[in-house]
């Protein structure tokens, strides 16, 4: 399956970058990705984000029966409007895309849940009814969110063994005017706060694994389902890169 059907309705070629943030997290790239894929910390660490984004493992293909049934209603309604959203993951776990319902009928990941951009939507996506949030992950370096009013793109890039650059971009309809159609603080405040909170968690994790007392433990099958998928992809990819006696000799 290709990603194009999921993204075409948003017409990102006619969107513009309203804001860009760059921070360097004090942790290894792999820790940054694992932190992003793990669900345990959200309730206590992300008060802004969890106003609208559900603490659910549906985004990795897990979740309970009631959650799945509720999500199926949203997906079917969107498909009837020509907006794909059914969960799909590549065979090697590298890429995943799906649509999710935001909490309390929220339209956007803002403090209030109301659209950050008013009067305009991305591409052909309708403002009503609620179409939720399309999530796109692609290892090793990006996760993305697409709501009717704006899109978010995140990219991680290793800087050193203990430093990782995170670049975040907020995209809005090309015709949207700052101060008229959207307020920059309203647009960015949730994820600016979330990025800062995650950065602190990553730094703490980096300190923890550097301790001589550190021992890795098992992952929780439900709440860390996304981490397991990432680790499975990581291990399989590293193994392929190291296949062959010659390559292993070079590494040695």
Please state what every model-predicted region is.
Residues 1-252:
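C-terminal catalytic domain of Rieske-type non-heme iron oxygenases
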């Amino acid at each position: 399956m290709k990603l194009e059907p999921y993204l075409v309705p948003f017409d990102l070629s006619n969107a513009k970058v309203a804001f860009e943030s760059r921070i360097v997290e004090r942790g290894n790239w792999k820790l940054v990705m694992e932190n992003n894929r793990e669900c345990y910390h959200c309730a206590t660490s992300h008060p802004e984000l969890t106003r609208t984004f559900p603490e659910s493992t549906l985004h990795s293909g897990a979740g309970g029966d009631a959650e799945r049934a509720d999500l199926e209603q949203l997906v079917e309604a969107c498909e009837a409007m020509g907006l794909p959203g059914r969960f799909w993951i590549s065979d090697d776990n590298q890429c995943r895309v799906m649509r999710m319902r935001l909490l309390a009928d929220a339209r956007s990941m803002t403090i209030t849940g109301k659209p950050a951009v008013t009067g305009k939507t991305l591409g052909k996506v309708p403002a009503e009814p609620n179409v939720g949030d399309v999530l796109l992950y692609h290892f090793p370096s990006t996760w993305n969110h697409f709501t009717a009013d704006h899109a978010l793109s995140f990219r991680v890039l290793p800087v050193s063994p203990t430093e990782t650059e995170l670049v975040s971009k907020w995209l809005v309809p090309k015709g949207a005017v700052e101060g008229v159609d959207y307020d920059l603080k309203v647009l960015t405040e949730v994820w600016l706060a979330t990025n800062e909170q995650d950065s602190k968690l990553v730094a703490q994790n980096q300190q923890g694994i550097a301790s001589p007392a550190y021992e890795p433990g098992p992952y929780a099958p439900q709440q860390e389902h996304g981490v397991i998928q990432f680790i499975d992809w990581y291990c399989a990819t590293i193994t392929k890169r190291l296949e062959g006696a010659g390559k292993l000799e070079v590494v040695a």
